[in-house]
Every structure is written in C-alpha cells, then in structure tokens.
Amino acid sequence: MSSFVADKIVMDGLTYDDVLLIPAYSDVLPKTVTLKTKFSRNIELNIPFVTAAMDTVTEAAMAIAIAREGGIGVIHKNMSIEEQAHEVAVVKRAENGMIYDPVTIRKGRTVKDALAMMHDYHIGGIPVVDDDNRLVGIVTNRDLRFEHRLDKKIDEVMTSENLVVTHQQTDLAAAAQILQENKIEKLPVVDANNRIVGLITYKDITKAKDKPMACKDEKGRLRVAAGVGVTVDTLDRMKALVEAGADAIVIDTAHGHSKYVVEKLVEAKRAFPNVDIVVGNVATGEAAKLLVEHGADAVKVGIGPGSICTTRVVAGVGVPQLSAIYSVFDALKGTGVPLIADGGLRYSGDVVKALAAGGSSVMIGSLVAGTEESPGETIIFNGRKFKTYRGMGSMEAMEQKNGSKDRYFQGDTLEAKKLVPEGIAGRVPYKGTVQEVIYQLIGGLRSGMGYCGANDIVSLHNAKFTRITNAGVLESHPHDITITSEAPNYSRPE
C-alpha cells in the first residue's frame, strides 16, 4: 500500500543545529592547521570565507577587508554596470606589487580634478603626464592639503624637479630600498621614453608585509569577484566587470537549477573562457552536476537558509543546509569543482560543520553585515549601535532601479506592489571591523579542526557527525546561568 511517506519523502533534511561533529583522535594543534582552500576551479583562498553579493554586505570596502584576511568578496549587482565595475576597480587598485595601469592625470588639469580622482580611487598621489603619456611630475595629497584655489593648475603644485623613477626590471626589494633612501612614498616606473608604465608605493609594500595571507592575483593585486543576474544585459555587465579586473563572476540566482541559468552559463563561458564562473544557488546533487557539465567553475549551495530569507515559508521550497551541502559534495566528487556553502551560519561552529559536510568555503552575510566595512546604514536604537541588513529578496532590495528582482525571476514586474518578496529587511548589532570578526571565526574553525584531527579542509571532509535532539541543542548552549559578560564569538539565539 502506498503512502505519502513512502512515495513522497525522498530524504532526511538536516541542518546545523541537528548535528554535532564527533571528536576524533588528533595529533593536530589548532594553530598548525592550514586553512587554504579553493573558491573556484582556478582561484585559491587562504581562508575559506567569502562575503555575500548583498547590497548591505559587499562593496569595495568589504571586498578589500576580506581579501586582506585571505578570503574573497563578491560585489553585489544592485547598482548600474558602471558603478559595479568601479567598485571592482577600487578593489584591484587597493594593493599592488606594482600598479600596472596607474591612475594618471594630464598636465593642465586643476586641483579640483586631482582631489576628485584621489577621492574616487581612494589614492593619495597621482603621476602627472603630458599628451604622450610621458611623466612630467607627481602630485600627492600633501601638495594639495592646504591649497584653497581649486581652479589652480596642478602644474603649479606638483613635484616636477629631481623626480625619482625606476624601470620595469626593478624588483620590489630594490624598489623598497629606493623609496627608503630617497624618503619618498611613490615610485613611478617608466620605459626608455619616460612613458609611465607602472607605480610602486611604500604603502603597498608595507601592506604586503603586514598581511602575508592576503588573497592576491599573480600581479599582487587583491582578488575580487562580482555578481550578475540572468538578464538581457548580463554579458554587457560581465564584460565591464572583467575589464575592471574581476577575478571571477558569480551568476547569482535564487534557483540555479534552471534552463535560463544554464543557458546564461553557456553564453558566459563562451564569451569569457578564461574567467572562472561560479553559479548558484542549488540544493541538490542533480542540479550541481548539470551546472558543472555546462562549465561551472564552482557551485553555490543554499536555498533559503539565510537569516533574512523567506523562500522556504513563502514558496515552501528548500533543503536544510547540511543535507544540501553533502548532496552536492557527493555529486561533485572527482570533478575538481568546489562548492560554496551559502547561508544559515550563526556561529563559528556552523562554519566547521559546513566545511566538514563537504564545503570548500562558506559564504557569509549576517556574520559580517554589522561590521564597519559593510555598506549598510549605521543606526542607533535604544542607545545601541546597529547596521541595516536586508535580503536580496526583500521588497526594499527588489524595488530599486537596479534591484535584485531578476534574482527571483521577477525582472519583468514593473510595479512594486506586484512583487512577491522572498526576504526581509532588518538590523544587526554593530560588530567592529571585519578583521575582528574573521579572527574569531578562524579561531573557532581551527579549534574544530583540532578536535576532529583534521590538518586541512580536505581532511575535515572525513569527519563524522552525530544527530542530536532538541535537548542536545539546549545542552550545547550556556544554560542555568545569567550571562554577565558577553563573549566576542557568542550571543544567545533569539
């Protein structure tokens, strides 16, 4: 006799609070584990953290901060093509071994022009060139600090005499010595005709020493990814992002197991064969296989687990996150394609569980939405500091001019009142800097790997779980006590 359970229930769905990792024999110390992993087929990370392509999470400041820690940020697409490409460019110029395409300013421009460029590109100095791109001077923020005449030509304030320059063959160690000996902070790199071909800065050399684990490309620039949707201008957006320096493109939709997503993936790989294309979101091995067969370089996993997502209650669809992660992990064995576990993470222990279930990295939104570097608005409520945080399926995010309604396949809906949101908007407590948050997350991850005897993330995939009851969840949290001192890595579940 058939039954609903026998005919319709095809799997058990488990998520983070349903299980705990079983401690195992270990000869691994937390401080000795390696956190290196893959974001996509060709991009390595030094820590397994990716910041989400959300308009209250990742713009240039967040992407720079997470890349300096060793992860990567995905610039959201709720902006014009030009604005998103600019955010990518800002990240790529934030740090360099040598800046190969430095921002320059033409002789004859004004102080106002120079100040605007410094502000737009977050830089402190600009080489001045003539119409043939030959170096004629350099202007820095120190030259302009007390300059009140904004219409004054930069020729009158720039440094032009006894310019210290170097040539393309100079390595960074030699460049550092030149900077030190001449007590300067910027070293233009010129060719035999005195045309500028690069710029080496003291700040970049110092940053490289201070952040040795930063995630960088072969030119010494911070890595960054950028999100796109499935729209008529997707390829135009991709082209602008790739030209701006994006290391990877993330095709970001609510349902990656879709004909339209697959078609856009094929178009993207054909147009940009040398760029890694990440695709999501999915929740089954079948979906992941389909995407990889059509060229995906990484698969993003998660249908509705996020704190600001309502897909599971609005649409009745989803797979509890740990089961979804393992389903995709099992399907992708032997392909060399990593998976990104996206959503549902509240504590560092959840990160350990997500990676142990098969994730190569985790995508974080709420965990960093309250940081200084997030683009969310800072607000004061009842004397406490908060930052706004909203889902890309929220009404507020979808109804913007360049909003995210296409992510939920509602791109042709013109009236806001006709939109069907799959997310909410809210606020999260202010948390300080990304560096502080990531430090605690890494500490918890290292500890978990030590308990499991895993010296790297691939080894962590061999860890075993135990299913727990609601009583086990209660026992896992602090109990029978009034907390009088808050820990930086724990708050009671609401």
Region spans (language model):
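Short beta-strand/loop segments at the ligand-binding rim of alpha/beta enzyme cores
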Residues: E44-T51, G97-P102, E161, D217-G227, ...
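Active-site-adjacent beta->alpha loops and helix N-cap segments on the catalytic face
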Residues: K31, S80-A89, E147-D151, R195-C215, ...
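Catalytic cores of alpha/beta
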Residues: A61-I64, D236-A244, I277, A283-V301, ...
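Bateman/CBS regulatory modules and CBS-like beta-alpha motifs in cytosolic regions of diverse proteins
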Residues: V33-N46, A52-M54, E83-Y121, V128-D130, ...
